[in-house]
Structures are given as C-alpha cells and as structure tokens.
Amino acid sequence: METIHVDLAERSYPISIGAELFCNPAHFSSVIPAKKRVVVISNVTVAPLYAQQIIDTLNTFECQVSLLELDDGEQYKNLDTFNQILTFLLEENHSRDVTIVALGGGVVGDVVGFASACYQRGVDFIQIPTTLLSQVDSSVGGKTAINHPLGKNMVGAFYQPKAVIIDINCLKTLPEREFAAGMAEVIKYGIIVDREFFDWLDENMDKLYALDHDALIYAISRCCQIKADVVAKDEKESGMRALLNLGHTFGHAIEAEMGYGNWLHGEAVSAGTVMAAVTAQKEGLISQSDVERICSILEKAKLPLKAPKEMTVDAFMKHMMRDKKVLSGKLRLVLPTSIGSSEVVTGVSESVLAEVIEQCKA
C-alpha cells in the first residue's frame, strides 16, 4: 500500500492507495471515531457493489451508519441532487459532528463534497473514489461542485476531505470506456509536468489496461503525488494549479454543448488536450513531434482525438468564455510547451482558435 499526504497545515490529509482496503478497519478508524454517526452516499451503480463492505467495516467500531443512493450519471450532478442530499441529512437529524463518506466516481465525489461543505457550514467527509478518473484527479485537492445548465462546475467550493481511500480493486468492475476516460487525466499529468511519467505510460499502457497491480499502484500514486504537490502550493488555483486544467477549457465546452453525460469527462478532455496541443503548435510553443506523441498516446489509450463535428466555432467560444480561468473578459488557455512542460497563455486570437476548432473536429 502507498500513502501520500496532501500538506495543507491543519487541513492536511492522507491518500491511501492499495487493494482490499474496504475490509480493513484501520483505514477508517484513523479518521472516523468509534460510535460516530456516518452517512455513506453512493449511486445506484456503485452502492450494490461496495457499500455493504464499507458499512460492515464501520460497524466493527460501532458506527451508526445510514446509506443514501443517488441516480448515476453526469446529468445528475445538479442542484436537485444537491438538495436531495441536504434533505436526507436534515430528515435524519444529523448535526455538525456527522461524517459523510462519498463512495463513487467523480460525480458522487463532487456533489457530495459540495453538500458536505454547505451542510451546517461544513461537516467532515471522506472520499472513496471508485473510477480511475476520480482516483487520480477529482477526489484529491478539495474541488467540489455541481453543474449549471449554462456551464460545468459553475457552483461549488474548495473543501478538503479528511482522507481519500483508493482501492484499485474497484477498477475490476469499471467498464473499459470509463477506464479510458480516466486515462485522459493520467496522461495529462505527464504532459503538463512529468515527461518521464509520460514515457512510462507510453511503454506500460497494455499493463494498465490489463489491470496489472503494480502498474496501477504506480500510476495512481504518481498522479496523486503530482496533484498533492500542486495543491499544497496553490490550493485555490491562483497560479500553477491552473495547469491541471489542460484540455479542460475545450473539453468542458464539448460536455456542455453535447449534453452532460453524452461525452464522458475524460473523453472530452482528451479531445480538448489535442486542441490545446494544436493551438500551442500554431502559437509556436511546441514541436510537431511532441504534438504527434500526445495524439499517439491518447489514441493508444482508446480515447477520441477529434471534437464532435456538429459543434460550431460559435458554440465552442460561447462556452469557453464562461470558463473559470477567464479574467477580465480574456480567455486563458493551458497549453503544452513540450511533453513535461506547460503554461497558461492569454491572448490567443479568435482567428487561431477558429482554425483549431475547424481542424480538430471529426
């Protein structure tokens, strides 16, 4: 098992990464006191697979546990689901000493984290991510949010969990399409800051898709370590944390325009990463060979390289100008400058962006 620490002074917390963690009380009792009231919140897909294991483990130190199952899908990461959680907590008369466990993928983690941040001005919560994407990205760092019809993650808060518990055995029940979506975020880390990790991924893609234990532990641990280091330096995304959004400005536009859930987040990020790389090449920031390597590894990971053909330039620009990185009306893009290096760029012209969008559509 690997343990990584997110260093945020009094709000620091551990990330535990291994196998068979759900049945080990030690991973829970270190952050949840005995006899505590606990609410496990999952979705209708994940709860039947893993909720009872966790409830049984919590019962070993006499926690009082209740379970809430949410609908499954990005389209449910909304105000209605947020209110459903708050209503459940109120109807069960939970006070500020409750601990909430978010069991599921990125949607569950985001909406449950946001509800935890808001309920009685903040209660403890633990992230138990069950998808590759949530294990390497969304469960770590304290970003919580729900979507708005006009934009993704537009309503939310920075709110850190008390712990993150990652059991790689969950990936055995994950559909390959979802695994591939997670690989988009894994590859992102190599592109933005770690060329050596990028090279390792390129060489070990088959092992990862075969769910090789050691390969998964290494890849997930490396992603979490990179993110933990970035978050420790820039928790509220005032500087370098923005680099973690490579591909997301274009990608969020795809998700919003095509309807949440029709394109998986990682699929949209993959197409968005290609668009960012092509933009960087047109701006003279990255070599053609590095762009080709980025496209090659995404294709090897069974991810889309092209944006949907029906999306117009106007549709992209409408959504991109609502991006949270926009400052003073100016679009800021995370662009790779080489494999292992990236920067935030302001001032890419609309004509260049229009060229990129047309070039990168299916």
Swiss-Prot record:
Question: GO MF annotations for this entry?
Answer: 3-dehydroquinate synthase activity; metal ion binding; nucleotide binding
SUPFAM superfamilies named among the record's database cross-references: Dehydroquinate synthase-like
By its UniProt entry, which InterPro entries does this protein fall under?
Dehydroquinate_synthase, DHQ_synth_AroB, DHQ_synth_fam, DHQS/DOIS_N, DHQS_C
The answer to keyword Metal-binding applying to this record is yes
- Secretion signal, residue range per the UniProt entry: none
Its Enzyme Commission number(s) read: 4.2.3.4
Q: Which cysteines form disulfides? A: none
- Subcellular compartments: Cytoplasm
Sorted alphabetically, the Gene Ontology BP terms of this entry are:
amino acid biosynthetic process; aromatic amino acid family biosynthetic process; chorismate biosynthetic process
* Record note on cofactor: Binds 1 divalent metal cation per subunit. Can use either Co(2+) or Zn(2+).
Q: Where does the chain bind Zn(2+)?
A: 185, 248, 265
Query: Its domain of life?
Result: Bacteria
Residues that, per the record, bind NAD(+): 72-77, 106-110, 130-131, 143, 152, 170-173
Pathway where it operates? Metabolic intermediate biosynthesis; chorismate biosynthesis; chorismate from D-erythrose 4-phosphate and phosphoenolpyruvate: step 2/7
A single GO cellular-component term on record:
cytoplasm
Q: Name one Pfam family in it.
A: DHQ_synthase
Give yes or no: UniProt keyword Nuclease.
Answer: no
The protein's annotated catalytic reaction(s) are: 7-phospho-2-dehydro-3-deoxy-D-arabino-heptonate = 3-dehydroquinate + phosphate
State the needed cofactors, names only: Co(2+); Zn(2+); NAD(+)
UniProt keyword terms in alphabetical order: Amino-acid biosynthesis, Aromatic amino acid biosynthesis, Cobalt, Cytoplasm, Lyase, Metal-binding, NAD, Nucleotide-binding, Zinc
Function description: Catalyzes the conversion of 3-deoxy-D-arabino-heptulosonate 7-phosphate (DAHP) to dehydroquinate (DHQ).
HAMAP family named in the record: DHQ_synthase
* Family in the record: Belongs to the sugar phosphate cyclases superfamily. Dehydroquinate synthase family.
- Official protein name in the record: 3-dehydroquinate synthase
Which organism's genome codes for this protein? Answer: Aliivibrio fischeri (strain ATCC 700601 / ES114) (Vibrio fischeri)
The organism's lineage is:
Bacteria, Pseudomonadati, Pseudomonadota, Gammaproteobacteria, Vibrionales
